Amino acid sequence: MSNSNYENIYKAFYCFSEATNSAYSAINTFLELPNVFNKYPAVISLIFSKTATLDSNINNIIKNGVIIYDISTALIGAINTFYKDKKLVNKILKDGQNAIDKLIETTTYLSPIVTDITNSYLVDPYKEENALLFDLQIPNSTSSDYYKLSGTESITLAEIEYY
C-alpha cells in the first residue's frame, strides 16, 4: 500500500472521529432541549395569573404598575429562555452539519484506497481467472489445532471467540 494511502487512512479515521464527536455533541445538546421547553408552561401560567389580577379600577394604578412590571419581567425571561433554546437548536444544526461534512470528507480520503484495492484485486469478468483466495493460518503452524482457511470458507463468531 502506498504512503499516500496510509496518509488517507489516517485522515479518514481523524475525520470519522470528528464526525462522531460532532454527532455526539448534537445529540447531547438535543437532550438538553426538553429541560428548557419545560419552562414555557410555567412562564405562560405566571403571565396569565398576573394578567388576571389587574384591577380595572383607575385608583389602583400603582398596583397595576407592579403587576405589569411582573408581567414584563416574566416576558423578558421567556424571551431569554427562547433565545437560549434558539442557540441550542442552532448548535444542534451546526454540530449535525459538521458531522455530515466530516463523513463526506472521510469518504474522499477512503475513495482512492478503495479504488486501489479494487484495481489490484478485482478479477476481470471477461478473463478466465480464479477468484483471489486469502489463506489464513490459525493460530500458528506448530500448534495441534493448526489448520488453513481458504477464501471460500467462513469463520463463525463461536470459532473466533474460541481462539
Curated annotation (Swiss-Prot):
Highest taxon of source: Bacteria
Stored InterPro entries: DUF5424
Protein name as annotated: Uncharacterized protein RC0060
Provenance organism: Rickettsia conorii (strain ATCC VR-613 / Malish 7)
